[in-house]
Curated annotation (Swiss-Prot):
Segments crossing the lipid bilayer: none
Annotated organism of origin: Clostridium botulinum (strain Alaska E43 / Type E3)
Positions of short motif 'KMSKS' region: 228-232
An example molecular function term from Gene Ontology annotations: tyrosine-tRNA ligase activity
Gene name per UniProt: tyrS
Protein's GO biological process: tyrosyl-tRNA aminoacylation
This protein's name: Tyrosine--tRNA ligase
Residue ranges constituting the S4 RNA-binding domain according to the UniProt record: 340-404
Complex formation: Homodimer.
Amino acid sequence: MANVLDELLDRGYIKQFTHEEETRKLLENEKVTFYIGFDPTADSLHVGHFIAMMFMAHMQRAGHRPIALLGGGTAMVGDPSGKTDMRKMLTKEQIQHNVDSIKKQMERFIDFSDDKALIVNNADWLLDLNYVDFLREVGVHFSVNRMLSAECFKQRLEKGLSFLEFNYMLMQGYDFYVLNQKYGCKMELGGDDQWSNMIAGVELVRRKAQGDAMAMTCTLLTNSQGQKMGKTVGGALWLDADKVSPFDFYQYWRNVDDADVEKCLALLTFLPMDEVRRLGALEGAEINGAKKILAFEVTKLVHGEEEAKKAEEAANALFSGGADMSNVPTVTIAKEDLGSTVLDIIAKTKIVPSKKEGRRLIEQGGLSINGEKIIDLTRTLNEDDFEDGSALIKRGKKNYNKIEIQ
């Protein structure tokens, strides 16, 4: 069996190991069952999760078995890692809705047929735990002194860390133990912000089960300045087409900085690394060709080849006049809406996520209709704006929508 570790290292996925040599030997000699956890705090995954799923997909293609662990139980507590304040508490119903939505998205990326991968929910074992038994069986293996020194708790101690959240590390560690016992899971993969929690899980399995347990962290998706990627004018870059249209998703990758093209191709596509390096080395106008390939490949993986082609054609239509404009994301309004302010209409049709965001966009000169920059918040949308049957809205530099009258 080929060792996928070399491929993962070459592509830049891996940030840290708990046991590097043991991990290499295990991946060389066994079909390894591993897991990545996803807390269902929203009803869609975003691009930060996508890099983790690509990590899983590379492992699966090399013959290993992924478990996608949905945190229906841990979401009841909330992960304090990387947060300065306590997360908003979700109801059981909200969490279950999110779990169901995320399951559907995951099936686009990972092959769950014939036991090749599993989706499990930690609510199945966490919600019925006896607290005293849990403390005796699991809590005894955790040192409070060590927990307090963990990076995920440090930044919260001054602001206040609830006892509810303090339990999160124990619960995540217990997840690994349950998966180890039930499915023979020997490895956890996760974002680098989960390092402290992952170490806790590895140590718990090694102490309690006396077996192999190890962890690898995946690099976070950051740009060349070290800032997290995946933020848009409307917020997170969601993988749900109802939250971020395939066209806007395509445009995000089409417009990444030149310095980030090679990294994104390596982490977010299956293109061979020789091709990734060739594309990443292009300069000047040629790098735009590499960006188009990046945008198409990532959109194809997330939304399917048909939607990727539509997004590509729409972009060509807008920027070179060479294709069908029908693929530009389109919203409709009633004739009675004519005469309303542009601000009201773009908020009502969800072209912008909120009226506040629309106001900010107009005040900063980032909105135009049919090429006319909108600078007046009271500017109305009128029949004259629909001379060609539709009005073309431009947000920022390269985000477009069409408005049509029903």
